[in-house]
Amino acid sequence: MNVVQGNIESKNAKIAIVVSRFNSFVVESLLDGAVDTLKRFGQVADDNITVIKVPGAVELPLAARRVAASGKFDGIISLGAVIRGGTPHFDLVAGECNKGLAQVALEYDIPVSFGVLTTDTIEQAIERSGTKAGNKGGEAALGLLEMVNVLQALEEQL
């Protein structure tokens, strides 16, 4: 039996982090967690990490698509925070963002990690950006590092 899996060390990986500025008080903590994870666990060099900031979560897929189309990166981390309000806007933004990012991954055959919080309250978002519930930015980075290595291993074996 042949098992293909990836580890998290990716010293030479070139990683783009596409970040929504909306709800920046939460998203900046997600970014800190992602960068810390890339450096500490992935051993990714500063020069191999590019941060791209966009206005909001709806803009994440387009920026990720442009990054993927460049062919210069091994993976993309998307970070944002969509917090439910009193209108259906939350469902539209969260759904389109998720769908668009998944489409980029499939269209360009590049790992796109989803680190966009979709929470009911500000408190839940804060908890998931580095307090009680860990840092989902760091978790998104871990998943991305593993997928970069899985895809490289598949390329070598197939």
UniProtKB/Swiss-Prot annotation:
Keywords: Riboflavin biosynthesis, Transferase. It comes from the Bacteria. (2S)-2-hydroxy-3-oxobutyl phosphate binds at G86, T87, R128. It catalyses: (2S)-2-hydroxy-3-oxobutyl phosphate + 5-amino-6-(D-ribitylamino)uracil = 6,7-dimethyl-8-(1-D-ribityl)lumazine + phosphate + 2 H2O + H(+). Transmembrane segments: none annotated. SUPFAM superfamilies: Lumazine synthase. 5-amino-6-(D-ribitylamino)uracil binds at F22, A57, V58, E59, A81, V82, I83, F114. This is 6,7-dimethyl-8-ribityllumazine synthase. It comes from Shewanella piezotolerans (strain WP3 / JCM 13877).
